[in-house]
Amino acid sequence: RIRTREFKEDFSHRQLTREKLENLAEKWEEFNFVFCPNSGDETIMDDIITEQLGLPRGEYQYNVDHHIHHAYCGLNLAPHMDNAIIIVMDGGGCRKLWDMYPTHQEIESIYYGYKDEDGMHIEPQYQKLSNLRFIHDISEQFPNELSSFLECPLNDKVTLDGVDYELTSWPSMGMNFSNASHALGTDKLGRAAGKVMGMASYGHHQPQVFNRFNIAHELELVAYDYTVELIKKAIDYNPDCKNIILSGGYALNCTNNYKYLQKFPNHQIFVDPIPHDGGTAAGAALQMYQQMVDGIEPAYCKPSVWSES
């Protein structure tokens, strides 16, 4: 029998660092912890990618990023904005602090972006990262009634290279809409968060009336209040900037986006036209181009292309 209380204390006492997770993986051998590929796994992945691209071995490089690609895309498409506060929110991005917190992925990011004669520049200021998905993967090895018992109630905060990071086990607002889409039956996999956002407009605040429209409406109200506080935080980081760009899949919430204009009348708010993950393709290309302009070897460019450029 699994020593449930001991297991819970090991996992939920503090946010999981790489060192702690490696120790737990050794202690609890009966569990399969998928959190860090070994060198063999990385080699296999590199070989698959290079084969698909028709490149020889060693001719492919990559870097782990997601939210900053949303930021590049949004800033590039924002008309008449030479500088802006960029807020990215979605169901979950990359594991930005891979070396220290390998189970936590981006859920909220604040950047300051500006354009000048040398191109576009994105400066990270704040990120919140959640390990909820990892926790759920481990929780699935327990009975259903214990599915959430590993979540850590306390957030950790660290500052690295001038960027403030907050580590949590709670879901992002994007995750909440995804969970609601599954719970309300809009789809089987929780991929229809946008349907829940649209469904909210048909609901009302009616105490003791919990149909799917009213439930979606309540989530929409909670999400609005939460996001207002995040926008205030972003403004505190950049008090002199009056432009705001919203990106990430969560920025598809049209109803709340309109209300932010009313809440912040002294700011211009621009919503990235392609805030979903398709926009990250453009963002990655824009980031790579800027790195080449700046004389930095791009992480997404094979060595032979960089040497030829």
Regions inferred by a protein language model and the residue ranges of each:
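Short acidic/glycine-rich loops and adjacent helix/strand connectors
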Residues: R1-S309
